Amino acid sequence: MAETFMAREVAEIPAAAARFLDGSRGAVEAAAAALRERDPGVSVTVARGSSDHAATYLKYAVELLAGVPVASVGPSVASIYRRPLRLGNAACIGISQSGRSPDIVEMMRSAGEGGALS
């Protein structure tokens, strides 16, 4: 049986994770330090599609390991409806495959303006 595209992608995960950690070590360490210092009482995620599935996995990991509740917020709240969210004691985590999705970027900007660590 021929190897599927999904099987190839799954097999690439360890190398992709290593590349991410090697290339982003400074940013990851800075984010971890900011989270430790701020100690948010709640976290929110901003994502679409398959990235939202990754956010759901993150939700369970954070809730189980750190005891911090995590909720998903809709990017369109900021990008379409232009409504601010009060996120003063929150960490806001954006997940995007490209890092350039306009609605995710806009929600992250809005969350920062609303007081979130983003």
Please state what every model-predicted region is.
Residues 1-39:
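Cofactor-/ligand-binding subdomain signature composed of acidic, glycine-rich
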Residues 36-118:
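Glycine-rich phosphate-binding loops that contact phosphosugars or nucleotide phosphates
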